[in-house]
Amino acid sequence: MDDVAIRDMTGSQSVDRATKLLSLVGRQADGMTLSAVVEKSGLNKPTVRRLLLALIRAGLLEQDDRDRRYYIGEEAYVLGTLASGRHGLLRLSTESLHRLAQKTSDSCFLSVRRGASSVCLHREEGSFPIRTHALQAGSVHPLGVGAGSLAMLSALPDEEVSAVLEQNAAVLENQFPMLAPDELRRRVELTRIQGYAVNPGLILANSWGVGVAIRYPDGGVAGAVSIAAIDSRMQEPRQSELAVLLRQETSRIEIKLAEQFRDRRTRHIAAVARPLKRRSPR
């Protein structure tokens, strides 16, 4: 391997490691200490320090002068805001989440898939005084763990479900032994039959959830909306009633997604046609 190829490989590895640290710190609302970043990343301390300093220089991370913890930076917020115009599922879902929280008085969530994991993007609080704290904005779980997460897993093709479960086998065994791959396969089938996912207090005792997947116009999984409450508020017939409300709101979100993609396609066609029109003879 020549020197150029070695330099390219080293540079690519540094980028991969830096983005891993950015994602790791960015998902912790309370920030992270240097020792915590070292422990969670599996990298040595000098490498972590060097990469964190590079991310700080870019504005993607910042370090608080008082507690010396690392937090997501302003530039990451700017980039996220710009990306929301193209990947604006939260913007398209805000009204539905607010409406669900008002109608049910329970906490409502929007989650998206990231590889073999699910990430909670938003938590909308309801007015019911007793709340469940199983899921917060920024929470990451293996795909299939939690109602919204299970709804997304169940919406995938069988071969993709198998690939996800294989990838998550170790973490499921270590952190969620009650949800072994075979048990999740069973729950995927049940979710497909009834049309919505249920978490009967498996992650946090007495904290139940119901979730429904959101699909792109082509049928792919865009995310999921879910509702969580204490177990006494999740029994039948209310469980089925919540599922109906979730289906109504996910349908509204899917219509908005379809309109967004249609508008984007129209603008693209118009942009391509303009130079062709200028070249046409008069």
Segments from the language model and where they lie:
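N-terminal helix-turn-helix
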Residues: 1-86, 90-91, 251, 255-259, ...
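Short, structured helix-loop boundary elements
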Residues: 11-15, 69, 73, 86, ...
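Amphipathic alpha-helical regulatory segments at dimerization interfaces
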Residues: 24, 40, 91-103, 109, ...
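Amphipathic alpha-helical effector-binding/dimerization core
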Residues: 67-167
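Short, solvent-exposed recognition segments
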Residues: 129-203, 278, 282
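Extended hydrophobic
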Residues: 177-252, 259, 269
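Signal-transducing coiled-coil/dimerization helices and immediately adjacent hinge/linker segments
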Residues: 262-282
